[in-house]
């Protein structure tokens, strides 16, 4: 039994590398099954967000190199390039890392709550793929419990900040009066929902939600009194959009330099503020070269995020302690499980010996033997049989000079100093 947590994140890899290592939702089930088959991992799950791609694996004898090689091959990267950005945590460290991630302690935005939902989705997909078994399943449940305790017992979730909040905060710095601004939101997922909520609360004049399916866009738009359109309507909507924030799961850019140039001409070069939260990127980087466009990527949000996180630093210390306790408790309980099979076999052996001696005693009673003599013989016979195998092994270990094993036996049988009975003089 061993755990591995392996991957890249916003601290170790650029957005260019992260978008190349990201998994689409459609890829996950097949990738998990392929991972387990080709690397002989016993259990596996994949967490892939705009800021990280991580593999969680339970195995018996598996090196991190084989997993890295699979990941590099799957995404058509060189192993050297991936290794330069990757990190690996094993066993206790892997458990602690998962709990830190789920609690928001390893996020770009410290304490952001969305990561827990993303972790739960990773678990659900792994179950669908059939790559989660009892051990990784227990680890996920312990991870969710630890994250919940962090939320409940610390102030890590107060003063809400997120990538979405950071994007809106940046928009506030550029537009002094958001109530006169119009916003175009591309996508309809969790991050865009948060962006829409923040903009709505700030009283933005008009919000448009563009999505691949009109149905999903309409559901989100209805929640905030916005307008729903298809992705094909984006060029027309750009003309009236002061703020553009995009976060989809598209593998190709949705917004190109040409479309933005055309919109700027019709806007008479009135500036457009854009934030591309997606990985891979939704907006072509060349758009940022235009004079009247302020284009920011996820990586550009670091400074804004840092300013909004000062109030959470104290809470993070308490959260780290809770995570450490949770990780230690999980590993302790997991190691206890390793003794279950041995204890079960020992109990079965003891019960067999008991039944043999009990049957012998019952026969003696049926033949008219004295009840007290039968009980004494039953107790003596059971004691001798239970001690026979351990006694033989202890003598053998002593003859071999195995002092360590003898000390362990003394601890196993709770034989402290002075515990040996002495015959009365």
From Swiss-Prot:
User: Which keywords annotate this record?
Assistant: NADP, Oxidoreductase, Porphyrin biosynthesis
CDD domains linked = NAD_bind_Glutamyl_tRNA_reduct (cd05213)
Pathway given for this chain reads: Porphyrin-containing compound metabolism; protoporphyrin-IX biosynthesis; 5-aminolevulinate from L-glutamyl-tRNA(Glu): step 1/2
The reaction(s) this protein catalyses: (S)-4-amino-5-oxopentanoate + tRNA(Glu) + NADP(+) = L-glutamyl-tRNA(Glu) + NADPH + H(+)
Q: Which residue numbers mark the site Important for activity?
A: 97
Q: Where does NADP(+) bind?
A: 187-192
Question: What enzyme category does the UniProt record give?
Answer: oxidoreductase
**UniProt-recorded Gene Ontology molecular function terms:** glutamyl-tRNA reductase activity; NADP binding
Q: Which residues form the active site?
A: 50
**EC assignment:** 1.2.1.70
- Annotated substrate binding sites: 49-52, 107, 112-114, 118
> What residue ranges carry the coiled-coil annotation?
none
Q: What is known of its domains?
A: Possesses an unusual extended V-shaped dimeric structure with each monomer consisting of three distinct domains arranged along a curved 'spinal' alpha-helix. The N-terminal catalytic domain specifically recognizes the glutamate moiety of the substrate. The second domain is the NADPH-binding domain, and the third C-terminal domain is responsible for dimerization.
How it assembles, according to the record, is: Homodimer.
Give the PANTHER family listed for this entry. Answer: GLUTAMYL-TRNA REDUCTASE
Other remarks in the entry = During catalysis, the active site Cys acts as a nucleophile attacking the alpha-carbonyl group of tRNA-bound glutamate with the formation of a thioester intermediate between enzyme and glutamate, and the concomitant release of tRNA(Glu). The thioester intermediate is finally reduced by direct hydride transfer from NADPH, to form the product GSA.
Q: Which family does it belong to?
A: Belongs to the glutamyl-tRNA reductase family.
What this protein is called in its record is: Glutamyl-tRNA reductase
